[in-house]
Amino acid sequence: DGLAVAGEFGTKLCQAALETPGVGETFAAAVRAIEDRDTQALARLFAIAQSLPESERGLVSAFGWVSASLLQGTIKALLSADDPYGRRLAIAACTSHQVDPGPALAVAIADGDHSLRTRALRATGECGRRDLLPASLKALADDDVACRFWAAASAVLLGDRADAWRALSEHVRAGNPH
């Protein structure tokens, strides 16, 4: 909040802090960029987070921190973009504000990018999208272990008590992460 009160000076401090970007620096700069509706600064932050994955948590947290009303145009554009990274962050932002990403979720589940599929499968359960239960069950056979885990977890949340339970049990016995 102090950075917001500081206005342009606060924004400049955040930009300077990105010389050595970490989670906190990325978070502060992203909050300022979102509040200022600065698309160039957001694009720079996306590039930083993609090249330094440890800083992504700050970017995602900023999307969850700011008022949902500040995100409406930005998230809508990201959900319909070609870039899987931006779509993944948009889905994460939606779920952090308890907003259903809409039709973009079904499209993301079928995407070739495993990180986007993983986030979409997770969001399916978080949003209670029972219409996507068949897609979650189909994703139990995904090549990616994280996709399989979130498909199973979401399918259980959506009411499946057979295939998804077995998949979660196998996941745990195999010693997989999550």
Per-range role (PLM):
Residues P21-G24, S51-S55, D82-P84, G112-S115, ...:
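Short inter-helical turns and helix N-cap capping residues of alpha-solenoid HEAT/ARM repeat scaffolds
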Residues A6-A17, D38-A49, A68-S80, Q98-A110, ...:
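Amphipathic alpha-helical scaffolding segments comprising HEAT/armadillo-like alpha-solenoid repeats
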